[in-house]
Swiss-Prot record:
The gene is dlgD. Its EC number is 1.1.1.130. Pfam families: Ldh_2. It is found in: Cytoplasm. SUPFAM superfamilies: L-sulfolactate dehydrogenase-like (SSF89733). Disulfide bonds: none annotated. NAD(+) binds at residues 168-174, 224-225, 304-306. Its main location: cytoplasm. The active site is at residue 44. Homodimer. GO terms for molecular function: 3-dehydro-L-gulonate 2-dehydrogenase activity; NAD+ binding. It comes from Salmonella paratyphi A (strain AKU_12601). This is 2,3-diketo-L-gulonate reductase. It catalyses: 3-dehydro-L-gulonate + NAD(+) = 2,3-dioxo-L-gulonate + NADH + H(+); 3-dehydro-L-gulonate + NADP(+) = 2,3-dioxo-L-gulonate + NADPH + H(+). Keywords: Cytoplasm, NAD, Oxidoreductase.
Length: 332
């Protein structure tokens, strides 16, 4: 089914206000969920909203909490999220990293006691739109087996790197081949995954999203490489924030909350003039996209460049929402 941006935001706002969330907080949160969905990231927008409300109802999320700065070391700051709403807190933290970068050339905010930030790419994009390089990542509850194991002991720990090119170039990737949100998107659409995404119950690689969702044997990106990167990202976020690791979140909390996150902004224009920056970025992009194609029907893509088209299509033709997901939201 198709809905407008206003219908989508209105549905989110209604549910949030029914939980006695303050009007300004409900409006800002609903706006972010709707913008994520409008941008084509359904897995962490509309599809994720019922799960967000479940955690809100369970008390994992404290909607009136205010993040507090704990430590300030020039370009580096440490904050405690106080388990406030995840997407609103993450936006504020990247804004703060940008402010620090304006003063120091680089800004790093390490956040502890945070909630799920929904679409991590929103915060990298936020920096790149203002001309900064944006880098951020989060740890999570253990939802992926380390390479060589059957039992979940590491997080998917998504990493975002956004570059202020025209259009913005951005990698937004989980340390698994697919996020659990994308497994859900493919399952709801009745599609197999385009490549192997995990193991079946017999330990064989599989493209069936429902099987992986059920047994939790999701495949690390690049096999042992994604597993290793997940581990070191967790370690850095834990140390810089003095927050909880994947192990602590998993063993000590009843659900995924109290996670640790990193937000970095770099002011490129302090290091290179605008014309040179643009020319160098364009040369990189042209060199890549003019390579001979392996398949004439498959374009060579640069990461993140598809979002401009997805956003335009959704604004022109309406936002696609799965019927079953919309029914869940209407019932909240």
């Amino acid at each position: 089914m198709k809905v407008t941006f206003e219908e989508l935001k209105g549905a989110f706002y209604r549910v949030l206000r029914s939980r006695n969330i303050a009007e300004d907080t409900a409006d800002a949160c609903a706006e972010m969920f709707a913008r994520t969905t409008e941008s084509g990231v359904y897995s962490h927008g509309v599809n994720r909203f019922p799960r967000f409300i479940q955690q809100l109802d369970n008390g994992d999320i404290i909607p009136d909490a205010k993040p507090q700065r704990v430590t300030s070391l020039g370009a580096i700051e440490q904050w405690d999220a106080q388990r406030a709403i995840g997407n609103l807190t993450a936006k504020k933290m990247m804004d703060r990293a940008i402010e620090l970068a304006s003063d120091h050339g680089i800004g790093l905010v390490a956040l502890r006691n945070a909630n799920h930030w929904m679409r991590g790419g929103s915060y990298g994009w936020q920096a790149a739109e203002k001309g900064y390089i944006g880098i951020c990542w989060t740890n999570s509850i253990a939802v992926m087996p380390p390479w060589g194991a059957k039992e979940c002991r590491i997080g998917t720990n998504p990493l975002i790197v956004a570059i202020p090119s025209t259009p913005i170039t951005m990698v937004d990737m989980s340390m698994s081949m697919f996020s659990y949100g994308m497994l859900e998107v493919n399952r709801l659409a009745g599609r197999e995954l385009p490549v192997d995404g995990g193991f079946d119950d017999n330990g064989q690689l599989t493209k069936e999203p429902g099987v992986i969702e059920k047994n939790r044997r999701i495949l690390p990106m690049g096999y042992w490489k994604g597993s290793g990167l997940s581990i070191v990202l967790d370690m850095i976020a834990t140390l810089l924030s003095n927050g909880s690791s994947v192990a602590e979140v998993t063993q000590e909390n009843s659900d995924e909350y109290g996670v640790s996150q990193i937000f970095i902004a770099i002011e490129v224009d302090k290091l290179i003039d605008g014309a040179t920056r643009d020319a160098k970025l364009q040369r990189i992009m042209d060199f890549i996209t003019t390579a001979e194609r392996a398949d004439d029907n498959v374009a060579i893509r640069l990461p993140g460049h598809e979002f401009t088209k997805l956003l335009d299509d959704n604004r022109r033709h309406g936002i696609t929402v799965d019927d079953s997901v919309w029914a869940k939201i209407q019932a909240l």
